[in-house]
């Protein structure tokens, strides 16, 4: 069997489909290296027909780095590093915005691996957008304005208290998460630690304000940036099939899960790979 992976770009800026890998078995070092560099280059990659268990998903994710355990979402049985995103009428989707995962911590995730376990008959697509392409499309004066600015990211923006009052145990878990994750600052423009490329690093899910400018200026800048980053030309859209896998670079992308499938059910498993502290370095 050939060790060579087939990598087909899905657009000029972001996204590729990969075939020739069996993720139910450990990848060879050669194949993992190809996969790793494909994620760096294309920012999100997709593989079909990968019926992996939570344990196998964890093992694959651990080859990319140390894993994050989410403070609120439920975990797969016996595998704390795999969160279960089970959405249906009694538990509707709660992240109906474009976001980068877990930017409310000092070292936001470097990436994530998402596995489709149960899908609606139609709908439930996920879209990703490229912060690199969005940054490179800006004029030079506007890039200069943004470079060096810092923005606040707040856990509570996507996890407000009212959503976690069903039980006292749930509310207590939320309070503990808030105490452990106070608002913090990240650069508005982030330098990728491996490629050196610059990317916009603000997202509607967690970014609350730009601290180096006035309140009105912050509102205007964030309103523009949220709209600009999510322009269709910077996006790729994936129509899920059972046992599909998506792997993305969380440092330079945002994503949006379409909530158009209720009352049907959608179950996804996610492993989240820890990253490093965001920084900006002039190119």
UniProtKB/Swiss-Prot annotation:
Question: Per UniProt, which keywords does this protein have?
Answer: Dioxygenase, Hydroxylation, Iron, Metal-binding, Oxidoreductase, Vitamin C
**Control of this protein's activity:** Activated by ascorbate and inhibited by divalent metal ions such as zinc, copper and cobalt.
Knockout consequence?
Disruption of this gene leads to a loss of the ability to utilize taurine as a source of sulfur, but does not affect the utilization of a range of other aliphatic sulfonates as sulfur sources.
Q: How does activity depend on pH?
A: Optimum pH is 6.9.
Cofactor(s) recorded for this entry are: Fe(2+)
Q: Residues that bind Fe cation, according to the entry?
A: 99, 101, 255
Superkingdom of origin organism: Bacteria
Q: Write down how the cofactor binds this protein.
A: Binds 1 Fe(2+) ion per subunit.
Assembly and interaction partners: Homodimer. Was later shown to be a homotetramer arranged as a dimer of two dimers.
- Name of protein: Alpha-ketoglutarate-dependent taurine dioxygenase
The scientific name of the source species is Escherichia coli (strain K12)
């Amino acid at each position: 069997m050939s060790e060579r992976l087939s990598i087909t770009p899905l657009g000029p800026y972001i996204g590729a489909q990969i075939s020739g890998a069996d993720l139910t078995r450990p990848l060879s070092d050669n194949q993992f290296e190809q996969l790793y560099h494909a994620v760096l280059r294309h920012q999100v990659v997709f593989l079909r027909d990968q019926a992996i268990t939570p344990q196998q998903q964890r093992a694959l994710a651990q080859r990319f780095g140390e894993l994050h355990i989410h403070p609120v979402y439920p975990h797969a049985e016996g595998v704390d590093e795999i969160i279960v995103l089970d959405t249906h009428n009694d538990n509707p989707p709660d992240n109906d915005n474009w976001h980068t995962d877990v930017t409310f911590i000092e070292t936001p995730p470097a990436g994530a691996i998402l596995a489709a376990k149960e899908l609606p008959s139609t709908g439930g697509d996920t879209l990703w957008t490229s912060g690199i392409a969005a940054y490179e499309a800006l004029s030079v004066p506007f890039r200069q304005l943004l470079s060096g600015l810092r923005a606040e990211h707040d856990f509570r923006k996507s996890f407000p208290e009212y959503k976690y009052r069903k039980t006292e145990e749930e509310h207590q878990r939320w309070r503990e998460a808030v105490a452990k994750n106070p608002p913090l600052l990240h650069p508005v423009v982030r330098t990728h630690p491996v490629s050196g490329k610059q990317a916009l690093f603000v997202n509607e899910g967690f970014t609350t304000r730009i601290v180096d400018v006035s309140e009105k200026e912050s509102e205007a800048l964030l309103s523009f940036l949220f709209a600009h980053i999510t322009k269709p030309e910077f996006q790729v859209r994936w129509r899920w099939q059972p046992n599909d896998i998506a792997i993305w670079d969380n440092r330079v992308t945002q994503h949006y899960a379409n909530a158009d499938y209720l009352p049907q059910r959608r179950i996804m498993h996610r492993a989240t790979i820890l990253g490093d502290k965001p920084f900006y370095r002039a190119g």
